[in-house]
Design a protein with these regions (language model features):
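Short helix- or helix-capping micro-motifs
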Residues: 56-59, 164-169, 176, 235, ...
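Transmembrane signal-anchor helices characteristic of membrane glycosylation enzymes that use polyprenol
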Residues: 41-77, 289-307, 504-512
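Extracytosolic helix-loop segments that constitute the early lumenal/periplasmic catalytic or substrate-binding loops
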Residues: 61-67, 77-116, 120
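Short acidic/glycine- and proline-prone juxtamembrane loop motifs at membrane-interface regions
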Residues: 136, 173-186, 241-244
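Membrane-interface transmembrane helices that cradle and orient dolichyl/undecaprenyl
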Residues: 13-16, 34, 154-155, 194-227, ...
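Transmembrane helical bundles and short interhelical boundary loops of multi-pass, membrane-embedded
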Residues: 3-6, 14-19, 23-26, 219-227, ...
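Transmembrane-helix motifs of polytopic, lipid-linked glycan transferases
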Residues: 134-155, 193, 410
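Transmembrane-helix signature of polytopic, membrane-embedded enzymes
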Residues: 48-53, 147-170, 207-222, 427
Length: 536
């Protein structure tokens, strides 16, 4: 019996054209992927950016030169500020800069860039609190600005970008990180800026793929990707501040490759995996691995140029031959000495474990970071006579609870909307958060502190802003006339909830301001604001 619906069966039946009442079955057409939506930058974006930047600058400059330890640095400033001053004093030319020669605190265990940036402020304003804190404050403002820009790019929403920036302004971790002459603020800035450029590359790759002709088995070549190159530059700068920048190179590199694979698969490339490996991965390796590596080496230029930098001639002075790595002696002196320095630093970091007897009263493990359970004390002055009672001045690296206590819920929610609603806006902040959190779980025996979590803060702010966008669309119109009159338009219960939340963030920031700025307070007020035993 002939098979109905085929050309052969129709010809055997002597039928021309369509059979009355019968429709030829066809496969459903695949819906063409849509291009990324881009809303042009407008005047309202500039206004939002100016407001957030102004608030960030104000909050970070207030009390910037206080406190000190009798005019000298406090906390870990004692390491980095003298090292930066060494660079100023040994300055030879603007290309090379100076070197760290201060041996008072042992081996210099972080790359030079953070100290080089501190040295700019000290060069301009001298060895003063303003000199060693002005650059962190400015980079702290930049971190808030890029948090806004990242959210604006991901959501294409002025309002949500403004919300992310506003939350970042009033986060205690980002505030305190920006008020002291330490390194973390520089790395946080470069990381959040790298996330912004990576988001730009992902959008650009999507647009190029959408407009390309899909031919061959491997799909189109997408050309040189300047946003990805910029990401590599910023990741190289992050690595040149602290080695933990390596985690972001790995996570951002994998995200870039898998995004390209998803695009090729989404646009119907016959062999998307091979196409990604051949046409995307080599260029990604050049931009996201080679470029950061070259920039990292360049950050050591003053060390290579100097004759007196630490371990500069470890190969020829016998240091290497008596070490655990004598094989380095086969390499050229500069290379061998530089690698010996790095292996010595790696050995130092590996030795800072609880099991080997190292301990610190403010040690904090990664799971505690998720709720800001263990802040870290930066400054303390107690038993101050203030009339009818005693007072104190305290500064903690302390996360605003209205932000940090929502970290776990917003992470779970973001993963859910990614997996169930395919909301790709959360991908970059989620992966960036993972890069700053997951690797530390593998090293849980190591001494760790809450300032390691500083790079998590901008991405928490962005995810909270995206969640706020969902909440704002919920609910019904608030039936109160005064609310509508005050707003000038009908306000939904979801929008009202967002307003209440933002007010809570600002209110908590003000409530905890004494332990963020070192404001003198009575002991009884200190007891009131230290809610948890682990905060003390």
């Amino acid at each position: 019996m002939p098979v109905a619906g085929t050309v052969d069966s129709l010809s055997l039946m002597g039928t021309k054209g369509n059979i009355p009442g019968v429709t030829t079955a066809i496969s459903p057409k695949r819906v063409a992927p849509s291009p990324p939506v881009t809303i042009p930058w407008a005047r309202r974006d500039t206004v939002a950016l100016a407001i957030v930047a102004g608030l960030a600058l104000l909050t970070r400059l207030i009390g910037l030169t206080q406190p000190t330890a009798g005019g000298t640095p406090i906390f870990d400033e004692k390491h980095y500020v003298p090292q930066a001053w060494d660079m100023v004093r040994s300055f030879s030319n603007p290309v090379l800069g100076g070197i760290e020669s201060n041996p008072a605190y042992g081996l210099v265990v972080h790359p030079p860039l953070g100290k080089q940036l501190l040295a700019i402020g000290e060069f301009l304003f001298g060895y003063t609190p303003l000199g060693w804190r002005i650059m962190p404050a400015l980079f702290g403002v930049g971190t808030v600005v890029f948090t806004l820009l990242l959210c604006r790019r991901l959501t294409q929403s002025t309002a949500l970008g403004f919300v992310a920036g506003l939350i970042a302004v009033f986060d205690g971790v980002l505030l305190v990180t920006a008020k002291f002459g330490m390194l973390d603020v520089f790395q946080v800035f470069f990381i959040v800026a790298a996330a912004w450029t990576l988001a730009g590359d992902m959008r650009e790759a999507h647009a190029r793929m959408h407009h390309a002709h899909i031919t061959g088995n491997f799909g189109p070549r997408l050309g040189f990707r300047w946003w990805r190159f910029a990401t590599g530059v910023l990741l190289g700068l992050a690595l040149s501040v602290k080695w933990s920048g390596l985690y972001y190179i790995a996570f951002f590199g994998l995200l870039s490759a898998f995004w390209d694979l998803w695009l090729r698969r989404r646009y119907g490339v016959a062999k998307p995996v091979v196409g990604t490996l051949l046409r995307d991965v080599p260029a990604a390796l050049a931009s996201l691995v080679l470029v950061p590596a070259l920039l990292y080496i360049f950050s050591w230029r003053a060390w290579f140029a100097s004759e007196t930098s630490v371990y500069r001639h470890a190969a020829v002075d016998g240091t290497i031959s008596g070490s655990d790595w004598p094989w380095l002696g086969a390499l050229p002196d500069a290379v061998a000495s530089w690698l010996y320095y790095h292996l010595s630093v790696a050995d130092f970091h590996a030795s800072l474990t609880s099991s080997s007897g190292h301990s610190h009263p403010w040690d904090s493990k990664p799971w505690a970071w998720l709720v800001g359970a263990r802040p870290i004390l930066y400054y303390s002055a107690t038993d101050i006579d203030c009339g009818f009672t005693t007072c104190r001045e305290m500064i903690f690296l302390f996360g605003t609870p209205a932000i940090w206590w929502l970290t776990v819920p917003v992470l779970l929610w973001s993963a859910w909307v990614w997996l169930t609603r395919r909301d790709v806006r959360v991908i970059v902040p989620l992966i960036a958060f993972a890069a700053g959190f997951v690797p530390w779980l593998a090293a849980f025996d190591r001494q760790m502190y809450f300032f390691y979590a500083a790079a998590l803060a901008p991405f928490i702010c962005v995810l909270l802003a995206i969640a706020v966008g969902y909440v704002a669309r919920l609910g019904t119109t608030v039936p109160l006339k005064w609310v509508r009159k005050l707003a000038g338009y009908p306000v939904t219960t979801g929008q009202l909830a967002v307003i209440v939340y933002l007010a809570l963030v600002v209110g908590m920031f003000i409530y905890f301001a004494p332990i963020l700025y070192g404001i003198r307070i009575p002991d009884f007020y200190y007891a009131l604001i230290m809610w948890l035993p682990s905060w003390r």
